[in-house]
Amino acid sequence: PKSKGFNIFNRWQYTNTDKGVVGFLGFRFMKDEKDSGEDVDNMKVKRLPWLSEINTNRFDSNFKLGYVNPKIPYQSVGFQMAYSNHKQESFFGLRNYNIKQNSFYSNFIYNSIIGNTMNKFKAGLNYSYDDFEEFIDADKTIYNRVDKSIGSFFEYSYDSLEKLSLVAGLRYDFHNNLGSFFTPRFHIRYQPL
């Protein structure tokens, strides 16, 4: 196999501890070309060689912003977003496979306590979007699909710092293709001394 690629990544960070703010912004671009197959020069029997090629271009970006209350350090808010664009053109022998995908994700989360730091909770919202366009040579079909999902969650955690810890939560999601659904969560851990 032979390959050549190019990657560039850049990330910036902002921190202000007096105000409790931290932020990140990042970008990445990748170009990758791969060739593989049989070496026709060393073949004893002349025939069509099996070859493959994968050419990929990808762009990613992300953003994160967080705030921790300087006067109440157990209380925080966070927000993040991510976007990616992926394009791939390829063939494997006589079969072609091409895909384009655009993805977006965002998340908002709030953390705090109930009474004391042994009783913590987090609540939040998230949204995701995926747009796929696939071409599969086997049946000469283009498959297009869009997935969109929005969700919310609440999670409570208790930690006695000695023997017992537990996490209980509930999540609600609505998906454009799968409908709406609830997902409960419960974990308990007991550690005798």
List the model feature ranges, each with a label:
Residues 15-19, 70-72, 113-117, 161-163, ...:
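Outer-membrane beta-barrel channels and translocator barrels
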Residues 6, 59, 104, 150, ...:
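Exposed loop/turn and edge beta-strand positions of beta-sandwich/beta-sheet ligand-binding modules
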Residues 16, 27-33, 69, 83-87, ...:
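Transmembrane beta-strands of outer-membrane beta-barrel pores
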